[in-house]
């Protein structure tokens, strides 16, 4: 029997960056987040090409039992008084759960169950977050540095952005002096 040795992909746990030949990367700009922020005038006043967050992930086979691993890097910033955030989503297969691991920065994970119940969890280096099935999720950067979170989720989960329309998430997070405050947008 011939034994082979390989160097697997690496992740820097201080910043969430992957080292591998086939890392997939995607950047989401402010211009692609139309309708996400509460203040459309403030949103339009900022450069459309401004990168709000980047996702890098390792490729994986998309079939039952397989997992993706990736990192979201959410930039610090605001649109008006509202902190930068990811688009957020339910899973296309809503019974699929996910884990987030805080790596750097300070922020929040907004969880909204399909029944409308919301929870905000503080994200920081070392924090561990279970995103239950049937739960939409969004990262919010309340700090002054990049917020990075490593995620592990089933390759069959998919993303369902339309399930939150037309109202979006129930909660929004705004700056409140040096802190933050959450405001309900609807009942």
Where are these regions (language model features)?
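N-terminal capping/interface segment
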Residues: 1-14
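Weak global preference for isoleucine
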Residues: 7, 36, 128-131, 140
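Active-site region of the double-stranded beta-helix
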Residues: 17-122, 142-147, 152-187
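Histidine-centered metal-chelating micro-motifs
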Residues: 108, 128-129, 133-138, 158
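Charged, surface-exposed interaction regions in soluble eukaryotic proteins
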Residues: 121-125, 129
